């Protein structure tokens, strides 16, 4: 979303796509990611435990020992070719047997033995459906390059001036202070003097700020959630906008009382922080 003076517009921009208005053009270019369209993602347990990225997962001409060599498919079991040769082995007064000269280690066993050499990824808040898998990447390994082109006829003097008035109240807080767990600060934000306002709401104490989120405010009351990390046992976290903060702040819990994975992580982890 962009807001220039009274002009405001939003668009979901994909790779190599642009948001174009009369005054500005914003393009998403050169998206860098650890994932490629042809990659295969392998989960060895629950989705929350993450998975491995395979660049060369066999699908058609599989040899025994390749990743994905023996797989169940909608048309039956996929059986790989054997990379080797058979020869007859005979001994006196016994039935001849066939001896295989080649690889006898399956792709799964070979993968398990060398899984640390594959690139891995973490998964947070997964959502799976019949046709898609969505999750949040806690590693922040995705890098998007944004190119902004501004028209020459744009009046920069008026961009910082807005009639919008914002009042803030700190409603509640979840999580803990410190850098291990993180907290979720819930703010009640009142907007007057204009119908919509795109701006940033921050979570701060008297010393500094620990997190922010972009909010598209509407006239009246708005509820804004801010995720942050930091602070200490005496920090009173307040909701702030620009240089204005709520009149009161709230104290978060101690880190050893909350899970180390954070308030918004998987609840199945029972690891606790000692503070």
Curated annotation (Swiss-Prot):
Keywords: Disulfide bond, Fusion of virus membrane with host endosomal membrane, Fusion of virus membrane with host membrane, Glycoprotein, Host endoplasmic reticulum, Host Golgi apparatus, Host membrane, Host-virus interaction, Membrane, Phosphoprotein, Repeat, Viral attachment to host cell, Viral penetration into host cytoplasm, Virion, Virus entry into host cell
A GO biological-process term: virion attachment to host cell
Residues glycosylated per entry: 122
InterPro entries, per the entry: Gc_C_bunya (IPR048791), Hanta_Gc_N (IPR002532)
Domain of life of the native organism: Viruses
Pfam family membership, one: Hanta_Gc_N
GO cellular component: host cell endoplasmic reticulum membrane; host cell Golgi membrane; host cell surface; membrane; virion membrane
Disulfide bonds: 1-10, 18-27, 58-62, 164-194, 187-239, 204-209, 240-245
Coiled coil start-end: none
Family the entry assigns: Belongs to the hantavirus envelope glycoprotein family.
Protein's UniProt name: Envelope glycoprotein
């Amino acid at each position: 979303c962009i807001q220039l003076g009274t002009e405001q517009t939003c668009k979901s921009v994909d790779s190599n796509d642009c948001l174009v208005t009369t005054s500005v053009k914003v393009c998403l270019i050169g998206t860098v990611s650890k994932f490629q369209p042809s990659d295969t993602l392998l989960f060895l347990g629950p989705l929350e435990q993450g998975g491995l990225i395979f660049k060369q997962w066999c699908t058609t001409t599989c040899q025994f020992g390749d990743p994905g060599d023996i797989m169940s498919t909608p048309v039956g079991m996929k059986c790989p070719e054997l990379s080797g040769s058979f020869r007859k082995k005979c001994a006196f007064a016994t039935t001849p047997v066939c001896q295989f000269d080649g690889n006898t280690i399956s792709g799964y066993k070979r993968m398990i033995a060398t899984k640390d050499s594959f690139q891995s990824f973490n998964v947070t808040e997964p959502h799976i459906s019949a046709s898609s898998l969505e999750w949040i990447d806690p590693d922040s390994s995705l890098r998007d390059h944004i190119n902004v082109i501004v028209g020459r006829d744009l009046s920069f003097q008026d961009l910082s001036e807005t009639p919008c008035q914002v009042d803030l109240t700190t409603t509640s807080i979840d999580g803990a202070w410190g850098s291990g767990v993180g907290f979720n600060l819930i703010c009640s934000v009142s907007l007057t003097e204009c119908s919509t306002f795109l701006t940033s709401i921050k979570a701060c104490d008297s010393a500094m700020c620990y997190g922010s989120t972009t909010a598209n405010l509407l006239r009246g009351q708005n509820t804004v959630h801010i995720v942050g990390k930091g602070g200490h046992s005496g920090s009173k976290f307040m909701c702030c906008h620009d240089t204005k903060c709520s009149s009161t702040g709230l104290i978060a819990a101690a880190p050893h009382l909350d899970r180390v994975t954070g308030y918004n992580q998987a609840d199945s982890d029972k690891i606790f922080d000692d503070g």
